[in-house]
Amino acid sequence: MGLKAKHKENLCSDSERSKRLYVWIALAIVLSDFTSIFSHWIWGLLILYLQTLMDLPTFVMNV
């Protein structure tokens, strides 16, 4: 009897583990989507920043 109960416990923990794994995979997918969106924003901001840096000497010369 005790052995059967233990086996059931193991099955339960396995299903919980797989559920946790699916949650982590879903989180990873969502986070990767967010990071790709943010990376687009970051690249855009970097390009704008670089453009302003390139325009900075002319701006300083004008002042």
From Swiss-Prot:
- What taxonomic ancestry is recorded? Viruses, Riboviria, Orthornavirae, Lenarviricota, Leviviricetes
Record keywords: Cytolysis, Host cell inner membrane, Host cell lysis by virus, Host cell membrane, Host cell outer membrane, Host membrane, Membrane, Transmembrane, Transmembrane helix, Viral release from host cell
Q: How does it sit in the membrane?
A: Single-pass membrane protein
Subcellular localization(s) per the UniProt record: Host cell inner membrane; Host cell outer membrane
Q: Which domain of life is it from?
A: Viruses
One protein family per Pfam: Phage_MS2_lysis
An example of a Gene Ontology BP annotation on this entry? killing of cells of another organism
A GO term from the CC aspect: membrane
The name on file for this protein is Lysis protein
| Biological source species | Enterobacteria phage GA
- What family is this? Belongs to the Leviviricetes lysis protein family.
Q: What does this protein do?
A: Induces the formation of specific membrane adhesion sites between the inner and outer membranes, apparently leading to host cell lysis. Lysis may be performed via activation of host murein hydrolases.
Q: Which residues cross the membrane?
A: 21-43
